[in-house]
């Protein structure tokens, strides 16, 4: 007699298939994430209040780059393209040779992961969707702020360099280090972020800001 219902069995099969597909998507032949060359930008000297005001006003961007996720005994590397318009976004995650890809699109209260035009999954938050389908999650809601070099709403502890760039942040259980910035127009934006939470370590490289 089976102890798993048909619905539970289908749910387990779906999660297993997604995990296999995304593992194939993300795992590459190398185990290190190449960083961009050191920026030669001339940084803007500002007070933190001025810098925070300028960065918080940025609500639209197109960025691309790569990221790595390290867990005990496992390293995942992938490329990404991130389009943000207000609170709506679309993130494409793909392998280095563009053989596999998934798309995550979101707006307040609804996030969808697309594996193909006919196969998609939804949840109310990106963290919930990733936990359901992948078994782990990244703080995508907070990355909306961290990717710009500012804290997300809520309590935090922070350290700054002499230019008042945010260089270290502790928030929502995560430790974030901002090791490189680049100048884009009149603002300085993060180029490399390193996140850690327990045994999970994430490195995000932004190659191009638009």
Curated annotation (Swiss-Prot):
Cellular component terms per the entry's GO annotation:
cell outer membrane
What's the main place this protein lives? membrane
In the record, which residues receive a covalent lipid, type S-diacylglycerol cysteine? 30
The Gene Ontology biological process terms listed for this entry are:
lipoprotein localization to outer membrane; protein transport
Record's subcellular location: Cell outer membrane
Q: Which domain of life is it from?
A: Bacteria
Signal peptide range:
1-29
Q: Keyword check for Oxidoreductase, yes or no.
A: no
Query: Which Pfam families does this UniProt record tie to the protein?
Result: LolB
Q: Which UniProt keywords apply?
A: Cell outer membrane, Chaperone, Lipoprotein, Membrane, Palmitate, Protein transport, Signal, Transport
Q: Where is the lipid attached (N-palmitoyl cysteine)?
A: 30
Membrane topology, as annotated, equals: Lipid-anchor
Assembly, in brief, is:
Monomer.
UniProt xrefs under NCBIfam families: lolB
Q: What does this protein do?
A: Plays a critical role in the incorporation of lipoproteins in the outer membrane after they are released by the LolA protein.
- Report the family membership: Belongs to the LolB family.
Question: What name is this protein filed under?
Answer: Outer-membrane lipoprotein LolB
């Amino acid at each position: 007699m089976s102890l798993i219902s048909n619905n539970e069995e289908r749910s387990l099969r779906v999660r297993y298939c997604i995990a296999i597909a995304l593992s194939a998507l993300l795992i590459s032949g190398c185990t290190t994430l190449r960083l961009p060359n050191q920026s030669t930008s001339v940084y803007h000297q500002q007070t933190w209040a001025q810098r925070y005001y300028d960065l918080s006003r940025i609500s639209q961007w197109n960025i691309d780059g790569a990221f790595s996720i390290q867990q005990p005994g496992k390293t995942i590397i992938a490329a990404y393209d991130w389009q943000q318009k207000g609170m709506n976004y679309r993130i494409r995650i793909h392998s280095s040779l563009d053989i596999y890809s998934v798309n995550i699109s979101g707006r307040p209260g609804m996030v969808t992961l697309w594996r193909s035009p006919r196969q998609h999954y939804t949840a109310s938050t990106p963290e919930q969707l990733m936990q359901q389908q992948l078994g782990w999650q990244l703080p995508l809601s907070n990355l909306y702020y961290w990717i710009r070099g500012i804290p997300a709403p809520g309590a935090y502890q922070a350290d700054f360099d002499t230019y008042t760039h945010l260089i270290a942040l502790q928030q929502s259980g995560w430790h974030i280090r901002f090791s490189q910035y680049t100048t884009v127009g009149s603002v300085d934006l993060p180029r490399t972020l390193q996140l850690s939470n327990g045994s999970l370590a994430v490195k995000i490289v932004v190659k191009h800001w638009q």
